[in-house]
Structure formats: structure tokens, C-alpha cells
From Swiss-Prot:
Database matches in InterPro entries: PRC-brl_dom, PRC_barrel-like_sf, RimM, RimM_N, RimM_N_sf, Transl_B-barrel_sf
Gene Ontology CC terms, in alphabetical order: cytoplasm; ribosome
Gene: rimM
Protein name as it appears in the record: Ribosome maturation factor RimM
GO biological process, one term: rRNA processing
Organism name: Streptococcus thermophilus (strain ATCC BAA-250 / LMG 18311)
Length: 172
């Protein structure tokens, strides 16, 4: 079975079994909603068990999550440092123009017929995502995911078409 990372448990929160999660998904409200089923993996990426979300709330930059059956700090403390993942079969369909990170990472980025590089990471610094494009012989390119820059994403073809605005590529 294929799993996709949605967050990392960084600490406990209080005494009632809540966990502080650093989310790595654009869909935190969907992923951590009550009754959602997630998989727990240890720091060596070994599957531990499935967990069902009992409650979720936001606190500062974290998602605070509580799992069904784990209602005390002693039940959850051992999961600090573990990852939360979603099974591929539990992914929901997205609207046109929306993509899961795993669909974007690894795609080739082109400007016209010129290969620029490959998306290696997605950052979330603020208003829009920033795609980190690994290039040969040059430093990584930070590409904002905005309409004037990203013209087309064809996941099936493994290709992203962009138009680099002036100032985006400081190596030119």
C-alpha cells in the first residue's frame, strides 16, 4: 500500500492525549477532521498502526490532534517524532488546477522547449506555494505557484510549463 506524508508529531499538548502536529499538507482541515483514518509511522518509517481522529484544532502554527482511544499523555508520548500518513485509497479527488504534492514533486519544468529542471520540494511561505526546482549546474530555482508563472501542469505527461518573469532567475 502507498502512503503519503501529511504531518509530523513534534510534541504532546496538555495531559488529555492531544498531539502537536507540524502539518505538511495543503488540506489539514480535511486530513485531520473527526473520524479521518491516518497511519502512524515511526522515525525509521516503519508502520505502527492506523489511528482515527477524535478531534482537531489549530493552535499557532500547529495542528492539535487527538486520536480515538488515546486519551492521556501517557498513551501518546511515545509517538513524538512519528509521522502521520494517509493511505492512497483515502485521498479525495481534487478540483481542476489542484494537485497533491506527490503529483508535483519529480515533474520536469520547461520554459518553451527548454528543460529548466525538476521540482524537488514544495514550500508554503505565505500566500502561495513555492516550488523548488533542482537544476543542473545551477542553484535551485524558487518558482512561485501563481498564474503568470505556472502556465500548465500536465501530471500525466510529467511536465510543467512556465514563463519565468524578470528577476525570478538570478543566474541569468
Amino acid at each position: 500500500m502507498t502512503y503519503y506524508n501529511v504531518g509530523k508529531i513534534v510534541n504532546t499538548q496538555g495531559l488529555q492525549g492531544e498531539l502537536r502536529v507540524l502539518s505538511v499538507t495543503d488540506f489539514a482541515d480535511e486530513r485531520f477532521k473527526k473520524k479521518s483514518v491516518l497511519a502512524l509511522f515511526d522515525d525509521k518509517d516503519n508502520y505502527i498502526m492506523d489511528v482515527e481522529v477524535a478531534s482537531h484544532r489549530k493552535h499557532k502554527n500547529f495542528d492539535i490532534v487527538k486520536f480515538k482511544g488515546l486519551y492521556h499523555i501517557n498513551d501518546v508520548e511515545k509517538y513524538k517524532g512519528c509521522s502521520l500518513k494517509i493511505a492512497e485509497e483515502n485521498l479525495t479527488d481534487l478540483d481542476d488546477g489542484e494537485f497533491y504534492y506527490h503529483e508535483i514533486i519529480g515533474l520536469d519544468v520547461y520554459e518553451g522547449n527548454t528543460l529548466i529542471g525538476q521540482v524537488k520540494e514544495i514550500l508554503q511561505p505565505g500566500a502561495n506555494d513555492v516550488w523548488v526546482v533542482k537544476r543542473k549546474g545551477k542553484k535551485d530555482l524558487l518558482l512561485p505557484y501563481i498564474p503568470p508563472v505556472v502556465l500548465d501542469v500536465d501530471v500525466a505527461a510529467g511536465r510543467i510549463e512556465v514563463e519565468l518573469m524578470e528577476g525570478l532567475d538570478d543566474e541569468d
